[in-house]
């Protein structure tokens, strides 16, 4: 078993090797991803959609996020575990943001947190980093702000918007972010951001020039039954495999072939005779 991936190692990887990041929401998934050598596991607020069935990421709070982050932390022995700060857990004040971020490390045993936004959250990032809490930033298509964007729309498509995005990345890096997720932005803009900051960029729908990539594990494995973004590559169709297995289970229960003799527990012959005798005396 390799040692835990650390924040300094993530930062030092820039320009040397590509980083892999995936979401995870429970113990077994974290275990499998960890054994696959994934560098970072993000307990994303996408939990709301792909695990709990909500229509957006706004429907989870600190209680759910801490609960699932704890499960992932128990399964991941090598990967860096990052807790995603849910909507309104860091926007109200720097003090509240710092307190909630601390809960991810103290109670849920994560090694870092992630939050969305540019310069407006720089004070929160700075306070967290000064308190010893590593922070991953998130720019571009930030799902918690989808209502403001008018839906899940690509960001940074104009020269002015791209300029602001690059500046935001620089501000976040200066505030102390150890990496920054770039979601749903043009590839050339992502390349410019990557060149402009000293910490790794992690792309999701941001092209091949980022320092690493992140995807939602349910999308990767074909486990989500709703819309899958263009930038997703499905590496398996486990949803269909699960459906086939469960259909076979139901059929075998109905036709009596499960459980078979190999699934039964027996009783010693002498004890069986005693039991039969006891029944006969009734």
Swiss-Prot record:
Protein name as annotated: 3-methyl-2-oxobutanoate hydroxymethyltransferase
Organism this protein belongs to: Syntrophobacter fumaroxidans (strain DSM 10017 / MPOB)
CDD domains, per the entry: KPHMT-like
Pathway assigned in UniProt: Cofactor biosynthesis; (R)-pantothenate biosynthesis; (R)-pantoate from 3-methyl-2-oxobutanoate: step 1/2
Active site: residue positions: 183 (proton acceptor)
Gene: panB
Pfam families in alphabetical order: Pantoate_transf (PF02548)
Similarity annotation: Belongs to the PanB family.
Cofactor requirement: Mg(2+)
Catalytic activity annotation: 3-methyl-2-oxobutanoate + (6R)-5,10-methylene-5,6,7,8-tetrahydrofolate + H2O = 2-dehydropantoate + (6S)-5,6,7,8-tetrahydrofolate
Keywords: Cytoplasm, Magnesium, Metal-binding, Pantothenate biosynthesis, Transferase
Gene3D superfamilies: Phosphoenolpyruvate-binding domains (3.20.20.60)
Record flagged with keyword Thylakoid: no
Top enzyme category: transferase
Domain of life: Bacteria
């Amino acid at each position: 078993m390799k040692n835990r991936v650390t924040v300094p190692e993530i930062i030092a990887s820039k320009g040397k090797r590509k980083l892999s990041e995936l979401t995870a929401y429970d113990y077994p998934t974290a275990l499998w991803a960890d054994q696959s050598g994934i560098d970072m596991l993000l307990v994303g607020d996408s939990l709301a959609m792909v695990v709990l069935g909500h229509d957006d990421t706004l429907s989870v709070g600190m209680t759910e996020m801490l609960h699932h982050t704890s499960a992932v932390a128990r399964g991941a022995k090598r990967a860096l575990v990052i807790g995603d700060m849910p909507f309104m857990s860091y926007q109200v004040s720097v003090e509240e943001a710092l307190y909630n971020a601390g809960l991810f490390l103290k109670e849920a045993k994560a090694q870092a947190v992630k939050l969305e936004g540019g310069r407006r959250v720089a004070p929160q990032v700075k306070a967290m980093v000064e308190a010893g809490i590593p922070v991953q930033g998130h720019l571009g298509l930030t799902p918690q702000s989808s209502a403001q964007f008018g839906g899940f729309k690509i960001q940074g498509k104009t020269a002015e918007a791209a300029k602001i995005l690059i500046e935001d990345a620089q501000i976040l890096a200066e505030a102390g972010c150890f990496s920054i997720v770039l979601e749903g932005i043009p590839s050339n803009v992502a390349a410019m951001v990557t060149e402009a900051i000293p910490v790794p960029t992690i792309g999701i729908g941001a092209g091949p020039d980022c320092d690493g990539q992140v995807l939602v594990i349910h999308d990767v494995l074909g486990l989500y039954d709703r819309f899958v973004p263009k930038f997703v590559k499905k590496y398996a169709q486990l949803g269909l495999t699960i459906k086939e297995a469960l259909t076979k289970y139901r059929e075998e229960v109905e036709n009596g072939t499960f459980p078979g003799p190999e699934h039964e527990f027996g009783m010693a012959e002498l004890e069986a005779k005693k039991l039969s005798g006891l029944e006969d005396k009734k």
